[in-house]
């Protein structure tokens, strides 16, 4: 019996009674003031409630004060019926809503937000960039556009002759046309055929050959204004057009000869010393019935394309992608023509930004280019 009473006393000493309090965020008005606890770490704010615009009923009456000691002095939980009669249970006042919201510093209280629900602002997605795969074509003849010049005709003062360097895989012919316009199937039509008839000159296959127009067949540019020579007309009539053409014999009698062309369109600018400089504006290919416009790519290795008839490419850096710095670059950015990305980085870039990583110009499209060695079959 003594052991049982001792155990019950120990249980009573170890179980302390803590009166139940509703969480303060259930009240829109500050909760009723409670006696301060013994630890002294709780603070209550007694701010007056001022609601001049609302007519509110008086708060309910508080329960009568009791002669019992404060809750903090009760330290025994009732275990049986004999303890209930001496136990003190504090009564809580019902919630009283007044429109007053207490936003004091209290981690247990929820902040009150007035106004519409905030809407998350989403950033607009990057513009979609079209991703294409380049088609490799074989150019039979190429005019090196950096070597196109006008040379004075010594036998005819005031006249100029056309000169340039070219590479050819097959025999063919050049047609020099002054003030010519491109029509269907890359056919060049002269606008002044009576005054300046087209001049056709044959050539043989070979690399690094130099072409010079025959004396006496040049043009006198003194009849034209500088404005007409320095830019194409609205109808796309260029002052100088060079058409290089090769004809491949068919394998059978029933087939027609295969005609390939490269067309170089240029304007003429007068320099300070009185001479004229050729500025190539566009180069066009006509291969197997398809029209292609040549554009230089910046960042490709010229050593890969050595031995071909026409590279038209410039090397401006390493072979690695400028994003990951590991994979070889095989994708060009248009229209700035920077070959600087690998296919994987280009696929990610097209959904994230529309700026070239080299020059930061807008990207219109991405072109994947597969560079092969010259001895591979096409």
UniProtKB/Swiss-Prot annotation:
Myristoylated (in vitro). Its EC number is 2.3.2.27. It catalyses: S-ubiquitinyl-[E2 ubiquitin-conjugating enzyme]-L-cysteine + [acceptor protein]-L-lysine = [E2 ubiquitin-conjugating enzyme]-L-cysteine + N(6)-ubiquitinyl-[acceptor protein]-L-lysine. Acts as an E3 ubiquitin-protein ligase, or as part of E3 complex, which accepts ubiquitin from specific E2 ubiquitin-conjugating enzymes and then transfers it to substrates (in vitro). Pathway: Protein modification; protein ubiquitination. Residues 1-21 have a biased composition (Basic residues). This is Probable E3 ubiquitin-protein ligase LUL3. It comes from Arabidopsis thaliana (Mouse-ear cress). Residues 1-79 are annotated as: Disordered.
């Amino acid at each position: 019996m003594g052991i049982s009473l001792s155990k019950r006393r120990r249980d009573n000493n170890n179980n302390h009674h803590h009166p139940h309090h509703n969480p303060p965020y259930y009240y829109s008005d500050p909760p009723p003031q409670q006696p301060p606890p013994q630890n002294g770490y709780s603070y209550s704010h007694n701010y007056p409630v001022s609601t001049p615009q609302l007519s509110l009923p008086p708060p309910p009456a508080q329960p009568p004060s009791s002669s019992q000691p404060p809750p903090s002095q009760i330290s025994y939980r009732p275990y049986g019926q004999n303890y209930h009669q001496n136990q003190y249970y504090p009564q809580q006042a019902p919630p009283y809503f007044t429109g007053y919201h207490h936003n004091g510093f209290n981690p247990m209280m929820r902040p009150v937000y007035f106004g519409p629900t905030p809407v998350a602002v989403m950033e607009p997605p990057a513009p979609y960039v079209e991703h294409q795969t380049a088609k490799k074509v074989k150019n039979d003849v190429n005019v090196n556009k950096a070597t196109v010049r006008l040379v004075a005709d010594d036998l005819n003062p005031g006249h100029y002759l056309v000169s340039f360097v070219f590479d050819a895989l097959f025999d063919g012919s050049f047609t020099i046309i002054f003030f010519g316009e491109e029509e269907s199937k890359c056919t060049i039509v002269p606008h002044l055929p009576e005054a300046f008839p087209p001049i056709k000159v044959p050539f043989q296959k070979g690399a690094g050959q130099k072409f010079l127009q025959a004396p006496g067949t040049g043009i006198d540019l003194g009849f034209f204004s500088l404005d007409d020579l320095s830019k194409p007309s609205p109808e796309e009539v260029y002052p100088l057009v060079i058409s290089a053409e090769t004809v491949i014999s068919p394998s059978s009698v029933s087939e027609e000869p295969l005609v390939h062309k490269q067309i170089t369109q240029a304007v003429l600018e007068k320099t300070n010393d009185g001479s004229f400089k050729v500025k190539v504006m566009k180069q066009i290919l006509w291969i197997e019935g398809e029209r292609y416009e040549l554009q230089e790519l910046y960042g490709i290795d010229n050593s890969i394309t050595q031995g071909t008839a026409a590279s038209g490419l410039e090397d401006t850096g390493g072979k690695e992608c400028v994003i990951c710095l590991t994979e070889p670059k095989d994708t060009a950015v248009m229209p700035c023509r920077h070959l600087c990305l690998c296919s994987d980085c280009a696929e990610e870039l097209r959904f994230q930004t529309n700026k070239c990583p080299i020059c930061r110009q807008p990207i219109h499209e991405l072109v994947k280019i597969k560079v092969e060695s010259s001895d591979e079959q096409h």
